[in-house]
Regions:
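Extracytoplasmic/secreted envelope proteins and their assembly/folding machinery
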Residues: 9-13, 62-70, 97-102, 135-142, ...
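C-terminal subdomain of the subtilisin-like protease fold in secreted/lumenal serine endopeptidases
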Residues: 113-123, 136, 148, 245-288
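N-terminal domain-start motif of subtilase-like serine proteases
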Residues: 1-27, 51-55, 183-187, 273-274
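Extracellular S/T/G-rich loop segment that most often corresponds to the catalytic His/Ser-adjacent loop
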Residues: 31, 147-150, 155-245, 249
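Solvent-exposed, acidic/flexible segments
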Residues: 4-9, 57-62, 90-97, 131-138, ...
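Sec-exported extracytoplasmic/periplasmic mature domains
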Residues: 20, 70-74, 78, 102-110, ...
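Substrate-binding/access-modulating region of protease and related hydrolase catalytic domains
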Residues: 22, 87-171, 222-234
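Subtilisin-like serine protease catalytic core
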Residues: 14-46, 53-97, 113-118, 193-197, ...
Length: 288
């Protein structure tokens, strides 16, 4: 089970076998602190910044999201480069997330054209005033990212206009991991969900294995029979990285439209991300 669920599913490994691995694409992650030496992603961390994680250096969340996006054996885009900014989300203060995003934008400014950071994966909701304080600081930073052409994807959606793409958790079928039509929205413990809005996109979260490291040099893996939407955001960012490798001219809005228009229909009638159809459509329609 541990090994089988390293597979991202939905045909991603067939794309990787064709050389579509996110190579040359720069992405960012804002999440909890991370020990950067895990073999899954040690050579993928381009830069690391700590906004003030109270002296903590390790977490459960950090290595999980990094491995799901760009892990060597787990990730959707194992050759993407990660700019990682750690922020203490448990303090429920979005000023740290805003600081993290501004750091990403500073890194982005220093990068040459053709090597810009394309997407920021945020497995949290720093724009939610019901959960966090100082959301105005986050919203201002997200607006700056939008102006810079950097797509910010959180559990609430896409950047300053989250309803452009509304993420939901999906369950992979253990017996048909590569078939998006065998997926459904929700969690393994649920019977199913109703059909959501047209811009909803369900992302694999359950039946996944992630990297783990709580003590420097003690590398491990954990299997999750049930994962939350936190696992889906880096998955989606990874699929986007595959798309940008195939066609670097895509804007953030364009890549979201393609993800939505190529989605498969799951067993409950909801839209499930379909990486293979997404890439095939880009190659056909854009000559990529």
């Amino acid at each position: 089970m541990l090994e089988a669920c390293k597979d991202p599913g939905l045909g991603v490994r067939s794309l990787q076998a064709r050389g579509i691995t996110g190579r040359g694409v720069n992405v960012a992650i804002l999440d909890q602190q991370l020990l950067t030496d895990h073999p899954e992603f040690a050579d993928r961390i381009a830069a690391y910044y700590d906004t003030g994680c109270e002296g903590e250096t390790a977490s459960m969340h950090g290595p999980a999201v990094a491995s799901l996006l760009a892990g060597k054996t787990i990730g959707v885009a194992p050759d993407a480069n990660i700019y990682y900014a750690a922020w203490p989300s448990w303090l429920m203060d979005s000023r740290y997330a805003a600081d993290a995003l501004d750091w990403v934008l500073e890194q982005n400014e220093a990068l040459p054209e053709g090597e810009k950071i394309r997407v920021v994966s945020v497995s949290a909701a720093p724009g939610s005033a019901d959960m966090f304080q100082n959301t105005d600081l986050w919203n201002a930073a997200a607006a700056r990212a939008e102006e810079a052409g950097v797509l910010v994807l959180t559990v609430e959606g896409a950047g300053t206009k989250p309803d452009r793409l509304m993420p939901y958790p999906a369950v992979l079928d253990p017996n048909a991991r590569d078939d998006p039509a065998a997926c459904r929205v929700g969690f393994p413990s649920e019977d199913g969900s109703s059909v959501f809005a047209k811009n909803a996109l369900a992302l694999p979260c359950s039946y996944r294995t992630t990297a783990e490291e709580y003590t420097a040099g003690q590398f491990g893996y954990t299997h999750y029979g049930q994962g939350g939407l936190s696992w889906g955001i880096p998955y989606c960012a990874g699929v986007m990285a595959l798309g940008w490798q195939v066609d670097p001219t895509l804007t953030g809005d364009e890549i979201m439209r393609y993800l939505l228009s190529t989605a498969a229909t799951g067993t409950d009638g909801n839209s499930i991300i379909d990486p293979v159809q997404f890439i095939q459509t880009l190659q056909t329609e854009r000559g990529a």
